[in-house]
């Protein structure tokens, strides 16, 4: 999935192939280890064949898909992307996974912009626990003024 820039979490892969989460997680780790080993061998042998390029997984990777599933308008989807880029650039929440941060961003924006999107709704489309969404949201709240442009705060009466 990552090679073709269709990034999916291990949980999503488990759902697609009707696997348990543990098996999918182990499978993803094993696949990554195998790809890395093949690339290492190619470099060691100075082969000119193409190294497998894995696209980086960031919160931005998941924003568009999650916002689409939640019917979030383009303006607020762009705001979520803007926040994801700032978080990544400034390494603001390094302890959470990219898809958890994406879920937290969407909830954060939904609260600021008065959308009727609950943690449970985000959980249903992303499989991120409500506790994790809440923890990410609290971390984002600490950086609200640097993450949300003043014009958006004004527009949504914050």
For each of these PLM feature ranges, what is it?
Residues 1-95, 99, 120-124, 134-158:
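A cyclin-like helical interaction fold
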Residues 1, 100-109:
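Short, structured motif recognition centered on aromatic/hydrophobic residues
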């Amino acid at each position: 999935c990552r090679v073709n820039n269709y990034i999916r979490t291990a949980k999503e892969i488990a759902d697609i192939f009707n696997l348990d989460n543990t098996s999918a997680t182990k499978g993803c780790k094993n696949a990554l280890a195998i790809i890395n080993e093949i690339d290492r061998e190619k470099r060691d042998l100075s082969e000119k064949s193409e190294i497998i390029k894995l696209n980086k997984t960031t919160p931005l990777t998941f924003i568009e898909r999650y916002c689409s599933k939640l019917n979030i308008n383009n303006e607020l989807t762009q705001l979520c992307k803007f926040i994801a880029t700032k978080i990544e650039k400034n390494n603001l929440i390094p302890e959470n996974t990219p898809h958890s941060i994406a879920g937290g961003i969407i909830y954060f924006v939904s609260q600021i912009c008065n959308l009727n999107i609950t943690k449970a709704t985000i959980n249903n489309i992303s499989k991120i626990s409500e506790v994790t969404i809440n923890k990410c949201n609290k971390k984002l709240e600490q950086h609200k003024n640097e993450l949300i442009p003043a014009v958006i705060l004004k527009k949504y009466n914050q």
